[in-house]
Regions:
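Metal-dependent phosphohydrolase cores
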Residues: 2-179
Length: 179
């Protein structure tokens, strides 16, 4: 049983609000260039991999999955680093969380339930991540639980919660701000 099984939804919403405030704070700090460099060094093997680069061919909302994954990864890295968490796992898991190699909108046309992508793609992403990279158990949890609460399995680690929230913040940004 995960520690997150004990928390009510209100507490998770409060955490979401706190992470949003922390995000706004960390973006304005002067050491952004140094942090971007640190982040890139942690994930450059993934960013340069031929299979991962294929994500540039698939759309997310208003951008490519590649760009979305980079944003989620960097935001997760910044929050995890600021809170003293495993920022390397957050950065790598955040980058690999949507590592599926198909156009989900085309698939949605043929999906009778019109909902399977949201529940299945974390496991497809994990399978791809394990095929091309070394993935530890924390990164596995990050990848498979990033769709919480759409998927009912609760995140096991605090870094998984950070990536899940970062994914939602990034999707909102892409959908609303960049529309």
């Amino acid at each position: 049983m995960s520690i997150f099984d004990q928390f009510p939804i209100e507490l998770l919403l409060l955490l979401f609000s706190l992470f949003t405030l922390l995000f706004a704070y960390t973006i304005q700090r002067p050491s952004t260039h140094l942090l971007r460099t640190q982040h890139t060094l942690l994930v450059e093997d993934i960013l340069q991999h031929d299979q991962f680069l294929k994500l540039k061919e698939y759309r997310h909302h208003t951008n490519h999955i590649y760009d979305h994954a980079r944003r989620v990864s960097y935001l997760s890295f910044r929050i995890s680093k600021a809170l003293g968490m495993d920022y390397q796992a957050a950065a790598r898991g955040g980058l690999l969380h949507d590592f599926f190699l198909y156009d989900w909108r085309e698939r949605k046309q043929y999906d009778e339930k019109r909902s399977s992508h949201g529940k299945e793609h974390p496991f497809i992403a994990l399978e791809n991540a394990k095929t091309y990279f070394s993935v530890n158990s924390l990164e596995e949890d990050i990848i498979t639980k990033h769709m919480f609460p759409k998927t009912l399995a609760l995140p096991r680690y605090k870094e998984s919660v950070v990536v899940s929230i970062s994914d939602k913040i990034s999707a909102i940004y892409e959908y609303v701000v960049r529309a």
